[in-house]
Amino acid sequence: MPRILVIDDEQLLRSTVVTILTRAEFSVEEASDGRAGIAMFHKNPPDIVLTDIFMPNRDGIEIIKELKHSSPRTKIIAMTGGGHLRMMEIAAAAQVLGADHVLDKPFDSESLLAAINAVLGSLPPPKNQVGA
């Protein structure tokens, strides 16, 4: 089962995303800011990181830079709100840095799950374990 780390400082949005992903039978962990999210990532790297862009204690752009530098194969979905033009600028910056997908807030559960499934389709197959 793919593991997802959700990093967002907005508690209500984070809880909603965690609920949607848990109901879809994903294993989910959550962090309330960038610093906590990076620490959780390094402790137990997930398959996918779903991160807000605008947060205290390390924003999403910093998270994308660090995680792609330390773990280039990590799949990252960036979430952001804002005006349309601003969203396009942020999406372009996030993708240049290595985000695999960008979700514009607010989004519905179908859009969230479609983004997760699109990113899952690009995950490498699991390594075969000898003797398993």
Which residues are covered by each model-predicted region?
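Active-site beta3 strand of CheY-like receiver
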Residues: 44-50
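Alpha4 helix (beta4-alpha4-beta5 surface) of REC/receiver domains from two-component response regulators
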Residues: 62, 83-103, 110, 114
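Active-site residues of response regulator receiver
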Residues: 8, 52
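Two-component/phosphorelay signaling modules centered on CheY-like receiver
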Residues: 11-29
